[in-house]
């Protein structure tokens, strides 16, 4: 269950960068086990002791660094739940590349639930990239249920770029984001479903601080008899700006329900 094999390499080339290597700041989780990890001078990764997951500490001196935290599940019948916390100090500038790929050639469900929390201090800039992908000719389902919590301090910025490439039978995404004064948020969700697949995204963005802003964009393709639901909600509690955009291409007998909501 803990071996790095050709399937692992193929999935990493899709959800991370081509020719993923054990360099820089990284942690590779494979079938519920951390295969390898590494630190840099300004990025430290520590495994939690009370539950599965890790704490990632990013120094304010980190400028232009990239952190890789991919997950691969390729043994049928695995349910993997992981809790990851990212602590980004004031002034840091960092890219975090996440994502999960599932290969299922068996008859049992493969499932990964990633609970990610980002604690972003003043004037820090974060780009978060997440790709989800499924493959395999087994009858077992490939399920991904991510939960993302983001807390933005004054003058910080966060770009969240997510993509569900293909092959995920069921996904339920829950996202909660809080913005303080002059914090900036951009969310881009790209999603593709086919066959009988289903996808649900619920997102709540609370703008507590004056001059905070949020842009939320969803672009999706639905094929076959797949079903998608996208429900983003922007809540303004101060002078702020919010924009929500939902674009879909609907094919065959697929269904898409977009419910953009602004409450201010």
Regions inferred by a protein language model and the residue ranges of each:
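Short, Gly/Pro- and small/polar-rich lid/capping loops
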Residues: 1-49
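Conserved beta-strand/loop scaffold segments within soluble protein domains that form the structured core
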Residues: 36-264
């Amino acid at each position: 269950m803990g071996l790095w094999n050709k399937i692992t390499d193929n999935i990493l080339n899709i959800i991370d960068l081509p020719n993923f290597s054990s360099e820089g700041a990284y942690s590779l989780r494979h079938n519920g086990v951390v295969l390898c990890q590494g630190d840099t001078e300004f990025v430290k990764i520590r495994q939690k002791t009370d539950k599965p997951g890790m704490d990632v500490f990013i120094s304010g001196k980190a400028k232009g660094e990239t952190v890789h935290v991919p997950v691969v599940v390729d043994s049928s019948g695995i349910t993997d739940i992981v809790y990851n916390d990212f602590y980004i100090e004031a002034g840091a500038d960092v890219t975090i590349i996440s994502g999960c790929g599932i290969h299922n050639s068996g008859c049992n469900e493969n499932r990964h639930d990633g609970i990610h929390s980002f604690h972003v201090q003043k004037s820090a800039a974060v780009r978060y990239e997440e790709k989800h992908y499924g493959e395999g000719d087994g009858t077992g389902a490939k399920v991904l249920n991510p939960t993302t919590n983001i807390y933005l301090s004054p003058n910080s910025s966060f770009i969240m770029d997510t993509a569900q490439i293909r092959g995920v039978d069921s996904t339920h995404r829950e996202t909660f984001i809080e913005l303080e004064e002059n914090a900036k948020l951009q969310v881009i969700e790209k999603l593709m479903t086919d066959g009988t697949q289903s996808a649900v995204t619920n997102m709540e963005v609370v703008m507590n601080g004056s001059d905070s802003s949020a842009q939320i964009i969803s672009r999706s393709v639905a094929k076959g008899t797949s079903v998608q639901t996208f429900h983003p909600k922007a809540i303004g509690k101060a002078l702020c700006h919010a924009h929500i955009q939902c674009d879909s291409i609907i094919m065959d007998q697929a269904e898409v329900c977009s419910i953009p909501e602004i409450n201010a």
